[in-house]
Amino acid sequence: MKIKFNSPLVLGFVFLSLAAMILNIVTAGASNHLVFMTYRSSLADPLTYVRLFGHVLGHAGWQHYIGNMSYILLLGPMLEEKYGAKRLLGVIALTAVITGLINFFFFPGVAICGASGVVFAFILMTSFTGFKKGEIPITFILVAIVYLGQQVYDGLFVKDNISNMAHIVGGIVGAVSGYLMRKK
């Protein structure tokens, strides 16, 4: 029996995020602020555009990293096998850019980092894996209610350091992507 490097996109994402995490520790947070965190900054700064994508690779600490990567490693390989690396990379990039832009324009005093939006996109996409034309899986409805409902509740009533917006937007991107890619 041999070890197989399955799911190159997902594993690449996990290892890039690990490198960003280690770099953040080595630089005492400077790399996250510079590249792996999105916040309102000058549109003339080229790193503003890098951060729109890069913020999904950065994490605030090991617990944040391990939590997100656990879900990505659990759900990602199945999604990569079903939809292909190119399409899944598109979902990751779309989630990153949309959450980054929303944060940039609507939450000017807030900096976000982490792959939580990608995790929520994967969760909602996964519920479409058994989708048949003309049907909406009950699992999708339940997952949407449980995961997105919790984020809406937390966003309204719980004051913490978590970007519920990124979770909700990631979930929406995943749901729409799962629906649009279901038969392709």
Question: What residue ranges belong to the model's regions?
Answer:
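A detector for small-residue-rich transmembrane helices and their helix-helix packing motifs
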Residues: 1-184
